[in-house]
Regions:
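N-terminal (or domain-start) structured segment
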Residues: 20-91
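Extracytoplasmic
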Residues: 25, 56, 66, 76, ...
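Bilobed "Venus flytrap"/periplasmic-binding protein-like clamshell domains
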Residues: 25-53, 57, 116-182, 297, ...
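A structural signal for short loop-to-beta-strand junctions that line the ligand-binding cleft
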Residues: 100-113, 118, 236-245
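Ligand-binding clefts/hinges and TM-proximal coupling segments of bilobed small-molecule sensing domains
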Residues: 137-154, 226-299
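An extracytoplasmic/periplasmic, membrane-proximal ligand-sensing/linker region
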Residues: 171, 175, 182, 192-206, ...
Length: 317
């Protein structure tokens, strides 16, 4: 997998960026995530939709570590589009955390995908009920360079905490779940969608699953200190898990100012006109609508020019 990934990136670094008019079809390279999450399913289904219905864009997806790596690949002009949570993209634009001293400029939003959430997964029989109960415990906070890690660091910072509040581990979600099943981890942080195939496997195993959110005071503090996050009630897609009070934001697909206007416009058109087909292929596309994209107007990260143009054409400002 990594060899294939490297080859794709090498070719993308050297290929010229040509307009649709010059090239006939724009070759869009789309950074997804690991194969375990909703984002990968969304991106691969959307690429198929583009290839089936666009006369001007040809799309292909690559696996990545997710939001943080995609932002870096966009900044390096190694991909044309990539998924990212708004908290990670905002952190990069502000030049904070991993981007301290070298903020990423020129990011824009092509479309809203779905809501994202922060939650904590522990074994079903765990005595932990709150974040505080995990102080000093063995907790996975995500792979460094990945979106889960960046999101969690920002949330901990908003609470006045650091990684060393726990005994931190830096594993992928799938590896963290395996470690938890072996008794080597006490908790796994998730920052992303309300479902994850690795967490579903955890729930189905003898270890079982309990999901922890945040207390009202923690939610208030987080949202006061990080405006990219809002209080939310997460209806988890894990059977038998009750709604979880937590914080969340938006998963979007991003580009930079280098993506031609006509390409981002075409992507929005395909997403809108063939939305029913998209939802048939992946239910995670249900909320990927022009109205939800328009709701992101006015944030730190602007909508792409092609997106704004398309929204005006269909009467959504």
């Amino acid at each position: 997998m990594m060899l294939i990934f490297s080859v794709i990136l090498l070719s993308s670094c050297t290929r010229p960026k040509q307009s649709v008019e010059e090239k006939g079809k724009y070759d869009l390279l789309f950074g997804a995530s690991s194969t375990a999450g909703m984002a990968y399913q969304w991106v691969t289904a959307f690429c198929e939709l583009i290839n089936d219905h666009s006369d001007t864009v040809q799309a292909s997806a690559i696996t990545t570590l997710g939001s943080s790596e995609n932002i870096n690949l966009l900044a390096a002009n190694e991909i044309d589009a990539g998924i990212s949570t708004n908290i990670v993209a905002s952190t990069a634009m502000l030049g904070e955390a991993d981007w301290a001293g070298h903020p990423v400029s020129g990011l824009n939003i092509v479309s809203y995908m779905y809501a994202d959430y922060c939650y904590i997964c522990v074994p079903k029989n765990s005595p932990a009920e709150t974040l505080e109960d995990l102080c000093g415990k063995r907790v996975n906070i995500g792979e460094k360079g990945g979106g889960v890690y960046t999101g969690m660091v920002e949330i901990l910072k908003a609470l006045g905490l650091g990684e060393t509040y726990f005994k931190p581990y830096y594993l992928s979600v799938s590896d963290a779940v395996s470690s938890m099943q072996d008794g080597a981890l006490d908790a796994v942080f998730i920052y992303g969608s309300a479902t994850n195939s690795s967490i579903m496997e955890l729930q189905a195993s003898k270890t079982g699953l309990k999901v922890i959110g945040f207390t009202p005071d923690e939610i208030s503090t987080i949202c006061e200190n990080n405006t990219a996050l809002k209080p939310v009630e997460m209806n988890a897609s894990y059977e038998g898990i009750p709604p979880v009070s937590t914080v969340g934001g938006a998963m979007c697909f991003m580009a930079t100012e280098k993506l031609p206007v006509e390409v981002s416009h075409e992507l929005c058109r395909i997403l809108d006109e063939y939305h029913d087909e998209f939802v048939t292929n992946t239910r995670w596309a249900e909320t990927s609508t022009p109205a939800n994209t328009a709701g992101l107007t006015g944030g730190l990260i602007p909508l792409s020019e092609g997106t704004a143009q398309y929204l005006r054409e269909i009467g959504i400002d």
